[in-house]
Structure formats: C-alpha cells, structure tokens
C-alpha cells in the first residue's frame, strides 16, 4: 500500500447539526422518495397511439434530452459538489441528490421501454449526441462542475435544476393538460418536485458561501451568474425552436422558460432577469403542474405524484366492539 492513511475518520452524527437546513432538506427528500416502477405507465399506451409521428418524435427527443441532463447531474454535478460540502450532513444530502438524479434518468428509460420501439429509442439517443444545442448546454454546465470554483459549481447546478430542465418539462405538462400521457406526466411531476428541492437547497448553500466573501467578490459572482444565465438562455431559445417549431409550440414554451430562469435567480438570492409580463405561463400548463392534478392511483396499481404512503396501526379485538 502506498500513500498515507487519513489520521481520523469521522462518523456522521445527525444529533449534532451544524446547519439545521441539512436535516430539513434530508427529511423532505427522503419523505419524497419514489421509484418509476410504481407508476403505471402502460396506462398511457392508448393515448400515445393517438399522437402523430412528429408528436411522438418530439416527445421522445425531449425525454432523451432530459435523460442526458440528469445523467450529467448524477455522475458529475452532485458528486463534484460533495467535496465542497461544509458539513457532513450536507455531504449526505448531496449523495441522496445524486442517487435521485440517477432515478430520474432511469425513469425516462421506463417511459421509453413502455411506449416506444427500439428504433425510436436508438434514433433519439443518436440525436442527443448530435444536437448542438443540447450538447452545448450540457458542456457549459459540466465545464463549471469540473472547475475549481465551488460557488460557480453551485450556481451552475441551480441553473440546471431550476431552469434548463424546464424547456423539456413543458411538454408532458402540455400533454397532461389535454388529457394525454397523464401517467407519464405524473412521473414528471415527481421529478419536478425533487428538482425544486434540489434547486432551493443548492441555492441556499451558495448564498451561505457568498456571505463569507467581500463585497467585490460577491459583485463578481453576481456578474458571472447573470452572464451564465443569458448564455444559457440564448442557447435554450435555439433548443426550443429546434424541438418545438414544427409543432408550433415554441411561443408557448419561451415564457415558461423565462419564468423558471427567474426562479433560478431567486434561488440564488438575485433579482429576476425577465419582466413579469414576459413570463406568463399558459394557464393550462400551470394547472397541470399542480401535484393535485396527478393521477391518484390505488394502493396496488401504483403511486402518483399526489400519492400518500399508506400507514397502519395495530388493533385488537376490542377495537371492533361498537
């Protein structure tokens, strides 16, 4: 064996918190735990067959793009931020996040295997490797993950979690608002629920880190973040046009993108970049985002985004003497 062993290894003690937010977020994430196998995606086969070939292709490409981003977040982003953690509990939260990002990526494969042919799947993954806009946004984020600035990593992560996913999330919410692919949309709501917590938590940790900087350093970081947002937004416009122009949906997607770009900035403690008038989300899509809009699957067939895990309480014979 070569090298020097660490002098001491510390066990994590959840009874001695350095930041109470770590436990709050841990409990939220573990309470939200889910797996795609519990969603009855096969119930969407009938409505999938009603989509045109162009609509099917766009849907598959959207989900493939989301798979790529989740893969990057699981294997590069969340893992890279573990080394930046200030508390052992933050490390634990980040390992949970990395695992759930892998669950998200696996979820799209569950959708594909249920609804799509092998050729459709293979064509979509080939497309994801060739699409310049998808590759560019992934490369921008991954480059910062592999850099040496912890706060830039966090800002990049928030941009991914709170902004870049949403040009893709629009599509299943659109279908759901029209009564199509409702179980698939329910799965996506579970993913959105996770990403909302991830974006909030990493943004909170970024703000905690910024508090230790000088005014000049904070100003530099704010300028960097705004430049990053506008670079990503310009690319995201091209990506949305590439995906949605043929269906005529692009003008509906762009306000939703701007709305979530502002949410990403808010998670980082910054003012919005886009006027409220330019961020008016289609009311039907907004309604579909409500977890209460999800399918309430029964206990045995599966669980939806509005599903509450069943509880039990032991009883005795006397409990039934009325």
UniProtKB/Swiss-Prot annotation:
Native source species: Mycobacterium tuberculosis (strain ATCC 25618 / H37Rv)
Free-text comment on the cofactor: Binds 2 iron ions per subunit.
Any Pfam family: Ribonuc_red_sm
Function per UniProt: Provides the precursors necessary for DNA synthesis. Catalyzes the biosynthesis of deoxyribonucleotides from the corresponding ribonucleotides. Two genes for this protein are present in M.tuberculosis; this is thought to not be the active form. When coexpressed in E.coli with nrdE the 2 proteins do not complement a temperature-sensitive E.coli mutant, whereas the other gene (nrdF2) does complement.
Cofactor entry: Fe cation
Subunit structure of this chain's protein: Tetramer of two alpha and two beta subunits.
GO cellular component: ribonucleoside-diphosphate reductase complex
UniProt superkingdom: Bacteria
Induction summary: Expressed in growing cells (at protein level). Transcription not induced under oxygen-limiting conditions.
The protein, known as: Ribonucleoside-diphosphate reductase subunit beta nrdF1
Keyword tags: Deoxyribonucleotide synthesis, Iron, Metal-binding, Oxidoreductase
Residues the entry annotates as binding Fe cation 2: 101, 161, 195, 198
Annotated Gene3D superfamilies: Ribonucleotide Reductase, subunit A
E.C. no: 1.17.4.1
């Amino acid at each position: 064996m070569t090298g020097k062993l660490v002098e001491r290894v510390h066990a994590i003690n959840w009874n001695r918190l350095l930041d109470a937010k770590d436990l709050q977020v841990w409990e939220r994430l573990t309470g939200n735990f889910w797996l795609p196998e519990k969603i009855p995606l096969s119930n969407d086969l009938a409505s999938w067959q009603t989509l045109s070939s162009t609509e099917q292709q766009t849907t598959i490409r959207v989900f493939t793009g989301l798979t790529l981003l989740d893969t990057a977040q699981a294997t590069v982003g969340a893992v890279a931020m573990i080394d930046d953690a200030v508390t052992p509990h933050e490390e634990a939260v980040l390992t949970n996040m990395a695992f759930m990002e892998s669950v998200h990526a696996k979820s799209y494969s569950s959708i594909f295997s249920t609804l799509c042919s092998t050729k459709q799947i293979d064509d979509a993954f080939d497309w994801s490797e060739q699409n310049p806009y998808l590759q560019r946004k992934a490369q921008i984020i991954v480059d910062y993950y592999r850099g040496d600035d912890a706060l830039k990593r966090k800002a990049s992560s928030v941009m991914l979690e709170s902004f870049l996913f949403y040009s893709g999330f629009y599509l299943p919410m659109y279908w759901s608002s029209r009564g199509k692919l409702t179980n698939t949309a329910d799965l996506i709501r579970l993913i959105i629920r996770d990403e909302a917590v991830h974006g909030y938590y990493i943004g909170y940790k970024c703000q905690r880190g910024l508090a230790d900087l000088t005014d000049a350093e904070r100003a530099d970081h704010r300028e960097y973040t705004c430049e990053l947002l506008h670079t990503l937004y310009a690319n995201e416009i091209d990506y949305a046009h590439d995906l949605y122009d043929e269906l005529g949906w692009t003008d509906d997607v762009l306000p939703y993108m701007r709305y979530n770009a502002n949410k990403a900035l808010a998670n980082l403690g910054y003012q919005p970049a886009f006027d409220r008038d330019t961020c008016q989300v289609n009311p039907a899509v907004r309604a579909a985002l409500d977890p209460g809009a999800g399918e309430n699957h029964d206990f045995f067939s599966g669980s939806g985004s509005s599903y509450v895990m069943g509880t039990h309480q032991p009883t005795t014979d006397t409990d039934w003497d009325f």
